[in-house]
Amino acid sequence: MSLVYMNIMTAFAVSLTGLLMYRSHLMSSLLCLEGMMLSLFVMATLMILNSHFTLASMMPIILLVFAACEAALGLSLLVMVSNTYGTDYVQNLNLLQC
């Protein structure tokens, strides 16, 4: 396994560890999710380029579209929670349930 793949897997693992450790603030959770999606995008792109599998060349673009939608929803939720409660704690999301 090449050094590039190891670095990308390490970036994914660090983002996952950050997501599991720093769960108190919504902004840090969203940043860790974006790091995970970015490393998945780069890994998928490299694998498709190395295997010369042209039929799956749209898969990284679709992944990037879903990452953008996730970021937009996450930021809108962050703005709503911070305007309502004044903080961005994840524990405030439990108060949104009916």
From Swiss-Prot:
Its EC number is 7.1.1.2. Gene3D superfamilies: 1.10.287.3510. GO terms for biological process: ATP synthesis coupled electron transport. It is found in: Mitochondrion inner membrane. Coiled coil: none annotated. The keyword Protein biosynthesis does not apply. GO terms for molecular function: NADH dehydrogenase (ubiquinone) activity. InterPro entries: NADH_UbQ_OxRdtase_chain4L/K, NUOK/Mnh_C1-like. It catalyses: a ubiquinone + NADH + 5 H(+)(in) = a ubiquinol + NAD(+) + 4 H(+)(out). The chain crosses the membrane at residues 1-21, 29-49, 61-81. It is a multi-pass membrane protein. Signal peptide: none annotated. GO terms for cellular component: mitochondrial inner membrane; respiratory chain complex I. Keywords: Electron transport, Membrane, Mitochondrion, Mitochondrion inner membrane, NAD, Respiratory chain, Translocase, Transmembrane, Transmembrane helix, Transport, Ubiquinone. Core subunit of respiratory chain NADH dehydrogenase (Complex I) which is composed of 45 different subunits. Core subunit of the mitochondrial membrane respiratory chain NADH dehydrogenase (Complex I) which catalyzes electron transfer from NADH through the respiratory chain, using ubiquinone as an electron acceptor. Part of the enzyme membrane arm which is embedded in the lipid bilayer and involved in proton translocation. Belongs to the complex I subunit 4L family. This is NADH-ubiquinone oxidoreductase chain 4L. It comes from Pantholops hodgsonii. The gene is MT-ND4L.
